[in-house]
Amino acid sequence: MLRDTHLALQRNWQSLRKPEKLDIEPGADDTRVATIIAEPLERGFGLTLGNALRRVLLSSLHGAAVTSVRIDGVLHEFSSIAGVREDVTDIVLNIKQIAVRMHGDGPKRMTVSATGPCEVTAGMIQTGHDIEVMNPELVICTLDDGATLGMEFTVESGRGYVPAAANRPEDAPIGLIPVDSIYSPVRRVSYRVEPTRVGQVTDYDRLILNIETNGAVTPEDAVALAARILQDQLGMFINFEEPQRLRAEEPRPELPFNPNLLRKVDELELSVRSANCLKNDNIVYIGDLVQKSEQEMLRTPNFGRKSLNEIKEVLSAMGLGLGMVVQDWPPENIEELVKRSDNPF
C-alpha cells in the first residue's frame, strides 16, 4: 500500500515533461546580456516559469550599491560646487548609477579626487581589492579649469531598492548625503513563450528569457540564482518526504533489448507523410517498426522510397534497423516497462 501511494505521488511530477535543453545565446557583451532558452516545457509552464523567474530576477538577487556620499565642502544635496557644471542633486543622481561588485561584507569605502578641466568618471574612483566598479565609463560630473573635487562613497550589500531616506543613519554627521540604492545586479528582464515540437506533438512551450545585468553577475548565473531562490521558497509547501527507500529498492530494470524499442514512433522527428503512414499501419512502438522489412514497408499505402530512407537514417542513429528480430516482442508488461524506462525511480 505504501509503495502504491509513493508511486501515485511521484506520478504527479514525473509524468510531466521536463526541459531537456537549455541554450545560452550571449549578446554583444556576454558578461551582461544574454538570451536563455529552455525547452520543451509542458503547455502553460512557459508562462508560469517565465513570470516567476522574471519577478525574482528583478527583486530578489543580492548585490552592492553606494548608500551615501560625502563631498568636500558640501553640507547638503541642494548645494552647488564652484567650478563644477552639475549641481549636487545631479551628481547624486549620477552616483546612484554606479555599478559595483563587492567581495565580502560591507560597509566599504571608495574615494575619488580630481582637478579640472576634466570629466570625473566612475573609472577614476579608488577602490580596495574587495570592490570592483563595473561601469567605469559612467560620467559623474564635469570640472572646469582649476576646479577641484573630492568625494568619499560608502558601499554596502543588500537586495532590491532602498530609498535614500532609509540610508540616512540616525547619527548621520553633517555633510553625509544618502543615496538611493539599487542593489539588484539585474537591470532588465523580458520573456516570451513560443510553441515547440517534440516528435509529432506541437503544443509544448519554449521559454525565451532576455536578461541584462550590470556586469556584477552574468545572466546565466543570475537565472540560476533565481531558480535556486524559487526552489528554496517552494520547499516549505511539500508536506511529504521523498521516497528514498523506494528508489533504492526499485533500480532501473535491465531490458533484454535496446531501450529505444520502447519509445513510440511519434517521438521521432519524421515528416508528416512518414508519420501518417506508420500510424495508418498501426505501428506504435519502435519495436514494432524494426521488425518490418523494407519490402513490407514499401507495400504500405503512400509510403515511398524517400520515407523509407528517412526512417532507416533515424533508426541507424539509434543503432537499429529494419528487418530485426526481437525475441518475445511485444512484452506482456510493455506499458509498465515504458513507464519505468522513462522514469527509472
From Swiss-Prot:
Record region (Alpha N-terminal domain (alpha-NTD)): 1-241
Keyword Heme: no
Region of interest called Alpha C-terminal domain (alpha-CTD), as start-end residue ranges on this chain: 257-345
EC number: 2.7.7.6
GO MF entries: DNA binding; DNA-directed RNA polymerase activity; protein dimerization activity
InterPro entries: DNA-dir_RNA_pol_insert, DNA-dir_RNA_pol_RpoA/D/Rpb3, DNA-dir_RpoA, RBP11-like, RNAP_asu_C, RNApol_insert_sf
Annotated Gene3D superfamilies: 5' to 3' exonuclease, C-terminal subdomain, DNA-directed RNA polymerase, insert domain, RNA polymerase, RBP11-like subunit
Any single biological process term in GO: DNA-templated transcription
Free-text comment on this protein's domains from its UniProt entry: The N-terminal domain is essential for RNAP assembly and basal transcription, whereas the C-terminal domain is involved in interaction with transcriptional regulators and with upstream promoter elements.
Protein name: DNA-directed RNA polymerase subunit alpha
The species this protein was found in: Acidiphilium cryptum (strain JF-5)
Gene name linked to the record: rpoA
